[in-house]
Amino acid sequence: MSKNPYEIEIIQKTAPYHPDPTMIFNHLCASRPGTLLLETAEVNKKRDLESIMIIDSAMRISSEDNSVKLTPLSINGTDILSTLKKTIPKKIEIYEKNNSTILVFPKIKKNIDEDKKLFSLSVFDAFRLMIRIFENREKKSKAMFFGGLFSYDLISVFESLPKLKGNQKCSNFCFYLAETLLVLDHQKKTCLIQNSLFSKNLKERKRIKKRSVEIERKLNEKLKLIPKTKIKDINLTSNMNNFEYGTIIKKLQKLIQKGEIFQVVPSRKFYLPCPNPLSAYQKLKKSNPSPYMFFMQDQDFTLFGASPESSLKYDEKTRKIELYPIAGTRPRGKTEDGNLDLDLDSRIELEMRTNHKELAEHLMLVDLARNDLARICKPGSRYVSDLVRVDRYSHVMHLVSRVIGELREGLDALHAYASCMNMGTLTGAPKVRAMQLIAEHEGEKRGSYGGAIGYFTDLGNLDTCITIRSAYVEKQVATIQAGAGIVYNSIPENEVNESLNKAQAVINAIKNAHY
């Protein structure tokens, strides 16, 4: 044991590799809450790269308004909390509720300049306080690994937006501090089990080492099949029919014509039963492999998806920060029987690439991404590394670009996320006014949709995707939300169809999983 009471002890061991992460996740986690599967793949080759699983969590960290709720899930987590409480600044109120500790942060003044707002004490500091009390002497890249989601509605803590009600239990953010990680490298075909020990408790250390051996043993077993649930009638419903959604599009277009905004992304929700989310995720991953795929099991909800779009990515070593705006969408070129017609597909791509409306919308959002980075990056460090490429998925193709900058000294990945949220491709421009209008016209919280899911570490790295092409499942009902980018010369009927096209891959996966 280390003599340093605040040093993280890392226990690592290799285990048998298996190419199917979904099967492993089911075998090790089943429906247990506080578990998470994050996966990455190459866009064009659709080849798996890495799968990271939180098998056990030491703590659940969630936020509502200006408070953060810390709930230990093991003795390991309880000891973190005991250490953390000794370091809480006086400006932060602290109280206990049931098994949780609540931190209440001062409300952020919303009429101050960007830098003052960025450096104000905020709910993000709950993570910073936790990271600062532990030493990662060996500089292991995932010693403190926080995996989870930032909801779209987190922005209301930092900006003046209409107050909305929501019928979902999704917090402003919900993260798990990993106690047991499993990392699959699909290129090297390796499997690593990693335990992070934050406690000095000898019994807890013994338990965690025993847990590592148990997981290795389970990985040598025949993997359990993912259970299936059949549903006779799967009816798709929506909170807005085509006419209602089209009416909102037309109203927002009038505001664009008046010059109030340049672009806006209204959305609508689709609902269908989903008693078996993991089976649906398995179908989605197979039919629509994407750069980012995720499956999150919380005590209140399950969230899964296959997102084409990075939200924000930060590498602490290089201090490079990336945004990946996607704007411009077309359906894939398919025949009536659903087979891909390569000639039709290429003609659709050509039409999209040369469409003035799509190009104007895309370049506007590239410019917005550049502006987002300008606030937090070193002057002269921003550049566009990829401009107007095409990425293809099972039901749609997109115009994409990549914008990169170098983060200013004194800022970290959480500062960067706070400054850039929510991504312009899910809001519009100018961003704050677009979000205000979205709130007024949609009339309810977006929850996970349009936020971000991924991870960050104590070493400062962050990798997230925008939570789109996803299903939020609560009480066995899936909510699939999708929108369309509206500009001056948008054709409302086309945008109505686009919202359904974007949701279709997830809808089909859920249906196919329950037949």
Curated annotation (Swiss-Prot):
Its EC number is 4.1.3.27. Coiled coil: none annotated. Chorismate binds at residues 328-329, 449, 469, 483-485. It catalyses: chorismate + L-glutamine = anthranilate + pyruvate + L-glutamate + H(+). Pathway: Amino-acid biosynthesis; L-tryptophan biosynthesis; L-tryptophan from chorismate: step 1/5. L-tryptophan binds at residues 40, 291-293. One of its GO terms (biological process) is L-tryptophan biosynthetic process. Mg(2+) binds at residues 361, 498. Its cofactor is Mg(2+). It holds the Pfam family Chorismate_bind. InterPro entries: ADC_synthase (IPR005801), Anth_synth_I-like (IPR019999), Anth_synth_I_N (IPR006805), Anth_synth_I_TrpE (IPR005257), Chorismate_C (IPR015890). GO terms for molecular function: anthranilate synthase activity; metal ion binding. Binds 1 Mg(2+) ion per subunit. Keywords: Amino-acid biosynthesis, Aromatic amino acid biosynthesis, Lyase, Magnesium, Metal-binding, Plasmid, Tryptophan biosynthesis. Feedback inhibited by tryptophan. Heterotetramer consisting of two non-identical subunits: a beta subunit (TrpG) and a large alpha subunit (TrpE). Part of a heterotetrameric complex that catalyzes the two-step biosynthesis of anthranilate, an intermediate in the biosynthesis of L-tryptophan. In the first step, the glutamine-binding beta subunit (TrpG) of anthranilate synthase (AS) provides the glutamine amidotransferase activity which generates ammonia as a substrate that, along with chorismate, is used in the second step, catalyzed by the large alpha subunit of AS (TrpE) to produce anthranilate. In the absence of TrpG, TrpE can synthesize anthranilate directly from chorismate and high concentrations of ammonia. Belongs to the anthranilate synthase component I family. This is Anthranilate synthase component 1. It comes from Buchnera aphidicola subsp. Schizaphis graminum (strain Sg). The gene is trpE.
